[in-house]
Amino acid sequence: MEKFTIHTGTAVPLRLSNVDTDQIIPAVHLKRVTRTGFADALFSSWREDQAFVLNDESYSGASILVAGPEFGTGSSREHAVWALRDWGFRVVIAPRFGDIFRGNALKGGLLPVELELKAIEEIWGRIEADPSTSITVDLAARQVQVGGVNWGFPLDEFSRWRLMEGLDDIGLTLRHEPLIGAFEASRQPFLPTIA
């Protein structure tokens, strides 16, 4: 997983609330277990509408999604995180996330940033007025900066550390590879049975 310290990019304003994982990536696209190749599936039902914000070329190349309350609710789908990452998003900013989505995002290298709705509305206004508006997300400082305005965001220390170190679950486990190898080398090749 790629390390995350500071990210600067443009953003897409998704003025919708209660966006569930089935809307992020419909179930018909869940037939693969690889983490890539899902960009075309992201919001595929909504993207059929040419007026949908991801179809607007002025937001092309954006790496931050700014959404409404309750983003990523519904069933657990790692594919939702994979689709967002595959599209190019590194950060999703919203007032509240579904708990399972939030956990999957943190483990998948997508930073879920929670800001108050008032801050979200200000950011929406800025990026709609000028789609080239730059947003900086500083994970070390736990701050979002747009223009000269800064907002702090909460994130537990362990999740912050994992993202800054670029550690997914496998990477975290591999940090203990010497200990795991020593244990495996010292244990019996079979387990005793109880007669």
Curated annotation (Swiss-Prot):
It holds the Pfam family Aconitase_C. One of its GO terms (molecular function) is 3-isopropylmalate dehydratase activity. Keywords: Amino-acid biosynthesis, Branched-chain amino acid biosynthesis, Leucine biosynthesis, Lyase. GO terms for biological process: L-leucine biosynthetic process. It is an enzyme of class 4 (lyase). SUPFAM superfamilies: LeuD/IlvD-like (SSF52016). The keyword Lyase applies. Pathway: Amino-acid biosynthesis; L-leucine biosynthesis; L-leucine from 3-methyl-2-oxobutanoate: step 2/4. It catalyses: (2R,3S)-3-isopropylmalate = (2S)-2-isopropylmalate. InterPro entries: 3-IsopropMal_deHydase_ssu, Aconitase/3IPM_dehydase_swvl, AconitaseA/IPMdHydase_ssu_swvl, IPMI_Swivel, LeuD. Gene3D superfamilies: Aconitase, domain 4. Coiled coil: none annotated. Belongs to the LeuD family. LeuD type 1 subfamily. HAMAP family: LeuD_type1. PANTHER family: 3-ISOPROPYLMALATE DEHYDRATASE SMALL SUBUNIT, 3-ISOPROPYLMALATE DEHYDRATASE SMALL SUBUNIT 2-RELATED-RELATED. Heterodimer of LeuC and LeuD. Catalyzes the isomerization between 2-isopropylmalate and 3-isopropylmalate, via the formation of 2-isopropylmaleate. This is 3-isopropylmalate dehydratase small subunit. It comes from Salinispora tropica (strain ATCC BAA-916 / DSM 44818 / JCM 13857 / NBRC 105044 / CNB-440).
